[in-house]
Each structure stands twice: as structure tokens, then as C-alpha cells.
Amino acid sequence: KDSKPQLLPTSIVNPIQMNLAFVELFAPATAMCKGDFDNLFVPFRCVASDVYNKKQLIMREGDLGDAVRASMSFPVMFKPIEIDSVLTYDGGIYNNFPTDVMREDFHPDIIIGSIVSSNPTKPNEKDIVSQLESMIMQKTDYSLPDSLGILLTFKYNDVNLMDFDRLKELHDIGYNRTISMMDSIKSRIHRRVNADNVRLRRMVFKSNLPELRFKNINIVGANSQQQRSIKKEFHENPDEIFTFEDVKMAYFRLLSDN
């Protein structure tokens, strides 16, 4: 009996539910800003990596969810995504402290930098993540002159890439450390705004986010008969509008059938 070839998974973390969550979280904001990240409530940048051309990609426009997803796709851990025909990975590969991007795009008076990692150390033969970091990650300059801003440095020697269950613990460490330095931060930033006013403007912005509604589905990697069958899971009538809840139900039905 011939044995079937064994295919290795493309990532340790299954991206199926994560990709769907990113649509729910970021698609309304993408529609609201019309793909221009300068038009978000807080103008946004992130960095991804084009490993084929060995360069960073500065994400200023497009699909917000794809940009964030690309910027965190550490090789092997998370499956990369394709943006404009380029396979994109974690931006930290080439620039893990993109203060240069902030200065070039926003010209800030003060940068508050948060350092939660360091340059790769000597790899451990029992730790595949440390081996990957040593092979992939480029050296990063984590310095920030006092004239440009303030550095918050955190030492997380016992934290690994997959420690998602420690989210609250790590959040609290970051929050408490920042609060302890608040006097220093405020001494560098003289402008003050009313917190209630900012909260109100944020509420107005979020209230204008469009509801997720769908009409067309683009399917890749299936023949015409399979495409028709898949589309029927989402809607019987090609002109029918359906909601994100409909998408989730159909999506997981298809996964369970598979």
C-alpha cells in the first residue's frame, strides 16, 4: 500500500479563528478610514517584512486587519499573509523599534518608546524559537536620545512568544511601570487635553463605524462547482446581503464539513 506524503503545517498557531477575529475587529475601521491610516481616530503605522526582498514594509494604507496581522506574523509561529503579491511577515525581523518611521511620518515632539525585547542571544539547542530568532531577526538599535523622547524598558527574561495565558500579568507590569514614570513623562509633555472630551470624540468616531454587511465572496483555490457549493453556505440569492454572524456560521459549517 502506497503511503501518502506527509505535509507539515505552515504554522504552529492555526490562523483560522484569528483571521476571522481580525475581520470583526478591523474591517469597520478600514471602511471608515477608506484605507488611509491617517484618517483613523489615532493615525496609525506598523511595520511588516518582505523577506524575499529583505526589506521592511511600512503599512500606511490598505486593509487595517491585514496590516496588523502581517506585522505580527513571526515565521513558523503564525502563517504569513500576502499583501499586494508580497508574502509578509513580522516587522520585527528588520525593524523591531521603528522610531525612524514615527519621526519621518509624524514628526512628533516626543516619542515614548517601549522596549520589551532585546537582540537575539545565543540560540538554545532545546528552544526552537531562540534558534529561529537567531537565524531570522536582524540586530535592532533600541536607543532613543533624550532629546527625542522617553524609553520604558521592561525585562521579560522568563516570557516566551507563546505565553498568551500571561496576558493580564504582562499588561499589569506594563501599566504599573508606566504609571511609576508618569511624572517624568508629564514633565516632557506640556500640552494637556480634557479626558472627557477625548472620550466623547472617540465615542462619536466609534458610533460612525459601519456595520459589517456582505454581498460578494471571492473564493480562491476551488473549481467552479466547489465555489457554487461554498457560496450557498453564505447565501442562496447572489443579491442577498448577509451579516458577520452569517459569515461566522457559514465559515464554521464549512470547516466542520471539511
What does each model-found stretch correspond to?
Residues K1-N258:
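Patatin-like phospholipase
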